[in-house]
């Protein structure tokens, strides 16, 4: 039995898709426990590039059943567009299942998300405008629509009519937009009911029975630790808990069944959207990382903000997630840059902080304290063992390991599935 959680350790886009793709071929189930089509994965298989949003990266593994968990919010139009796109490229999606308890994104969620961001103006959080936040708000407010509701039209209709009593008042009176007809939303959902119904399962039951049989389960977290609604840079966060604890809740698998928690972390740092970012670069090196690393959001198309590696955040992520291992990605991007600064602590109004400041005010005032290490000039994209890496690259990885509070068990040296160095195989430990 093995239950592994994959979690982003920074602000997302760390390469979780690659990690899941590599491990997904060795497990029996891959479950996405949180998020929706607001976060994307890029996976390269056989030279083919796949950009996944709502679907787990494990969908590209023929041997694994992929599950969209109860902690997810599902836009059905986006789901089936993604499925159809993969099938058109020859991918098999017949092994995809959806938790009956997953929340559904309604057209009014998307409308409210988009208009509210415009209404906020300069105070906008920087959402993707896909209705994720409003859907989670309805979930917590106990007025959400779940996937299983499509199996009973009377319940579906009742929930939609009740929701629109309030939503339309908000759209019309607060945002000066047109009201949405309940029947329009009912028909939208019913148009997908026949296709969705065969996919629905009790995901908690399925996953726990699989573990009882000694099978392997991989939980593929969306977004990242610093976007967690509790542990991230609030309010510049997502609306779910993309941390280890949230993965347990969003999949229905208890914490005592988890055998490994794998943090995915870049050899530098990126962020999309608004919010504090202590190591952010505004010079030629920021542009270099953005260009060389291909740092453009899969979902939004927005350029990612880039900065140096932040070990304060890495230590924080190790602590709140209980990571057993790290998967370091994009080490190859740092080849040939001369010197590599590493943030080892923060200066906050003249006081050194080796750990995350307690308040967001302090974090906004944090300036990085750097140490530097020499970069390497050799091409590392063909390295397949740690010993094959140049000595300077080895030293950089070892220093990150010392600073981050967790062993570096995997190292990405290129975008391909095979461009990975495995130091400790967590499926064999």
Swiss-Prot record:
An example Gene Ontology biological process: 'de novo' AMP biosynthetic process
SMART domains named among the record's database cross-references: Adenylsucc_synt
Binding site for GTP: 12-18, 40-42, 304, 330-332, 412-414
EC number: 6.3.4.4
Active-site positions on this chain: 13, 41
UniProt keywords, alphabetically: Cytoplasm, GTP-binding, Ligase, Magnesium, Metal-binding, Nucleotide-binding, Purine biosynthesis
InterPro entries reported for this sequence: Adenylosuccin_syn_GTP-bd, Adenylosuccin_syn_Lys_AS, Adenylosuccinate_synth_dom1, Adenylosuccinate_synth_dom2, Adenylosuccinate_synth_dom3, Adenylosuccinate_synthetase, P-loop_NTPase
Residues binding Mg(2+), per UniProt: 13, 40
Cofactor(s), by name: Mg(2+)
Substrates-to-products reaction catalysed: IMP + L-aspartate + GTP = N(6)-(1,2-dicarboxyethyl)-AMP + GDP + phosphate + 2 H(+)
Residue numbers binding substrate: 298-304
Cofactor, how bound (note): Binds 1 Mg(2+) ion per subunit.
Gene Ontology cellular component annotations, sorted alphabetically: cytoplasm
Transmembrane segments: none
Binding residues for IMP: 13-16, 38-41, 128, 142, 223, 238, 302
EC category name: ligase
Cellular compartment(s): Cytoplasm
Name of the molecule in the record: Adenylosuccinate synthetase
Organism: Corynebacterium urealyticum (strain ATCC 43042 / DSM 7109)
Organism taxonomic ancestry: Bacteria, Bacillati, Actinomycetota, Actinomycetes, Mycobacteriales
Name of the gene: purA
């Amino acid at each position: 039995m093995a239950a592994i959680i994959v979690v982003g350790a920074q602000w997302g886009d760390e390469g979780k898709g690659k990690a899941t793709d590599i491990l997904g071929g060795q497990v029996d189930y891959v479950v996405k426990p949180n998020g929706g089509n607001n976060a994307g994965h890029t996976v390269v298989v056989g030279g083919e590039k796949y950009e996944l949003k709502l679907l787990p990266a494990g969908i590209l593994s023929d041997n694994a059943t992929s599950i969209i968990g109860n902690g997810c919010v599902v836009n059905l139009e986006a789901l089936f567009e993604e499925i159809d796109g993969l099938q058109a490229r020859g991918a098999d999606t017949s092994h995809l299942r959806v938790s009956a308890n997953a929340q559904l994104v309604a057209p009014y969620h998307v409308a409210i998300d988009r208009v509210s961001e415009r209404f906020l103006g300069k105070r906008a959080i920087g959402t993707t405008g896909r209705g994720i936040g409003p859907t989670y708000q309805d979930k917590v407010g106990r007025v959400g629509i779940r996937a299983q509701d499509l199996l009973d039209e009377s319940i579906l209709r009742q929930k939609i009519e009740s929701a629109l009593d309030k939503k339309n008042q908000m759209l019309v009176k607060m945002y000066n937009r047109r009201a949405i007809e309940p029947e329009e939303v009912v028909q939208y959902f019913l148009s997908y009911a026949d296709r969705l119904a065969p996919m629905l399962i009790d995901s908690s039951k399925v996953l726990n029975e699989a573990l009882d049989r000694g099978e392997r389960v991989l939980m593929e977290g969306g977004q990242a630790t610093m976007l967690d609604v509790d542990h991230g840079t609030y309010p510049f966060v997502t609306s779910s808990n993309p941390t280890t604890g949230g993965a347990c809740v969003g999949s229905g698998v208890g914490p005592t069944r988890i055998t490994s928690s794998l943090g995915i972390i870049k050899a530098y740092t990126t962020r999309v959207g608004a919010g504090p970012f202590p190591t952010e670069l505004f010079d030629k090196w920021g542009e270099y990382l953005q260009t060389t690393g291909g740092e453009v959001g899969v979902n939004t198309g927005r350029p990612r903000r880039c900065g140096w590696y932040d070990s304060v955040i890495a230590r924080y992520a190790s602590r709140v997630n209980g990571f057993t291992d790290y998967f370091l990605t994009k080490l190859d991007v740092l080849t040939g840059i001369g010197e590599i600064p590493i943030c080892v602590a923060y200066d906050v109004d003249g006081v050194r902080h080796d750990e995350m400041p307690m308040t967001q005010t302090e974090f906004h005032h944090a300036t990085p304290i750097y140490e530097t290490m020499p970069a390497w000039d050799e091409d590392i994209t063909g390295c397949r063992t740690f010993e094959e890496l140049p000595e300077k690259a080895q030293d950089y990885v070892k220093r990150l390991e010392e600073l981050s509070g967790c062993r570096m068990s995997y190292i990405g040296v290129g975008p391909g599935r095979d461009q990975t160095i495995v130091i400790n195989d967590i499926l064999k430990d």
